[in-house]
Amino acid sequence: MIGLLQRVREARVEVAGEIVGRIGPGLLALVCAEQGDSEAQADKLLAKMLKLRIFSDEAGKMNRSVQDLDGQGTCGGLLIVSQFTLAADTRGGNRPSFTQAAPPAQGERLYDYFVAQARAVHPMVATGRFAADMQVHLVNDGPVTLPLRIAPG
């Protein structure tokens, strides 16, 4: 499973002009299930996202996670957006191949599982809409952008 994390001051996602998800300071997480992924990869990716220390402490060092933005237990937002294009293979030719992305039904099942698990352990979760044509608006903080990948099975 692949995740692309962006530390944001704020972010929102729109579908057909309607805001379907919005957060203040936190993480925008673009996620993609790959062929062979299961709940195990989703669990590992979520655990890594929530614990990754990419928010600054008082000294300006990246020592805080989205679960503790201020050192006092204040959680940041987590905006989760599905994006199968993260599985693109661009090695040959000029048109990317997406054969490594999970089939739509499996991708949606794992996305829904990932979101449900996130909501079970994190108080501020917003989402996009699976397979929708979305417009994602964000204000990068830093910028800090990190790719994560948990290898399939």
From Swiss-Prot:
It comes from the Bacteria. CDD domains: Dtyr_deacylase. It catalyses: glycyl-tRNA(Ala) + H2O = tRNA(Ala) + glycine + H(+); a D-aminoacyl-tRNA + H2O = a tRNA + a D-alpha-amino acid + H(+). One of its GO terms (biological process) is D-amino acid catabolic process. SUPFAM superfamilies: DTD-like. Transmembrane segments: none annotated. Its main location: cytoplasm. One of its GO terms (cellular component) is cytoplasm. A motif (Gly-cisPro motif, important for rejection of L-amino acids) lies at residues 142-143. One of its GO terms (molecular function) is tRNA binding. Homodimer. This is D-aminoacyl-tRNA deacylase. It comes from Acidovorax ebreus (strain TPSY) (Diaphorobacter sp. (strain TPSY)).
